[in-house]
Design a protein with these regions (language model features):
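The serine-hydrolase catalytic nucleophile loop
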Residues: 9-20
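Active-site loop/oxyanion-hole signature of alpha/beta-hydrolase fold enzymes
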Residues: 17, 25, 29-72, 227
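Single conserved hydrophobic/aromatic residue that forms the stacking wall/gate
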Residues: 1-7, 11
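Short alpha-helix in the alpha/beta-hydrolase fold that links the catalytic acid
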Residues: 177, 191-200
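Flexible "cap/lid" loop of the alpha/beta hydrolase fold
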Residues: 78-122
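Short beta-strand/loop motif that positions the catalytic acidic residue
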Residues: 175, 181-183, 187
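Catalytic histidine-centered segment of alpha/beta-hydrolase-like enzymes
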Residues: 213-226
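Conserved alpha/beta-hydrolase catalytic His-Asp/Glu region
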Residues: 111-174
Length: 235
């Protein structure tokens, strides 16, 4: 595809493996990024969405990427919003999955995570998959967040960053590239009506709702979603 050589898709690693492989095989240059403190990346986690957007820009500059297609899920949607707010000239297309322009987090969940309590992970798994038990390759959260230290140093920091991000309603107005919004009909973490409101705030956008799917779209319905995203990217 002509556009693929100029565009790179950015995913967080591991949870995106089924999607990443598919797009690589379709001749897209796929870049899977572990944020600082996550996966194979060293250093402490970045504690604000704004800092993450700035860090992503440094990565793209370092790699000399002129144009990128960003694909993000949940917290990643906030990161994409803030990136658009600051660096939209680099953007070619955006794909938002299971997210909104604001993502307040239950204080009880934050408290559990800050205390390194494994119940924080159990709660997240319950909310991620409630009403939908069909996902491919097992539940990834157990594999990614394994110890009380991980819960304190990674999960808690990410939850607070999401909770504290308040610029989304302004940032969404800066989006002027083609955008796709994907939501799971059974998502308990991002209400479908909230999601639709988010999508309607962007003029040049398309929305796809996946039946029988919860929050973890790219795992629960990997095969369906990658075909839909490919269709959007080829337009």
């Amino acid at each position: 595809h002509d556009q693929s050589s100029a565009a790179s898709d950015v995913y967080k690693r591991q949870v995106w493996s089924l999607v990443e492989q598919f797009f690589s095989n379709k001749n897209f240059n796929v870049l899977s990024i572990d944020l600082p403190g996550h996966g194979n990346s060293e250093g402490p986690c970045l504690n604000t969405i704004e800092n993450i957007a700035d860090w992503l820009e440094k990565v793209f500059v370092k790699l000399k990427l002129d144009k990128v297609i960003l694909v993000g899920h949940s917290q990643g949607c906030l990161e994409m919003l803030e990136y658009s707010n600051k660096y939209k000239s680099r953007l070619q297309k955006l794909v938002f999955m299971g997210g909104s322009y604001k993502m307040p987090v239950n204080q009880d969940l934050i408290d559990l995570a800050e205390n390194g309590d494994p119940d924080a992970v159990k709660l997240m798994m319950k909310w991620c998959y409630e009403g939908s038990k069909k996902f491919i390759g097992g539940n990834p959260i157990k594999r990614i967040i394994q110890s009380p230290k991980d819960i304190r140093k990674i999960l808690a920091v990410d939850l607070v960053a999401c909770n504290n991000y308040l610029n989304g309603s302004n940032a969404v107005k800066t989006i002027d590239c083609p955008s796709m919004f994907v939501f799971g009909a059974l998502d308990k973490m991002v209400n479908i009506e909230v999601g639709k409101k988010f999508a309607n705030m962007v003029e040049n956008s398309t929305t796809h709702i996946i039946d029988g799917c919860g929050h973890m779209i790219m795992i629960e319905k990997a095969f369906e979603i990658r075909e839909k995203v490919l269709e959007f990217l080829q337009k």
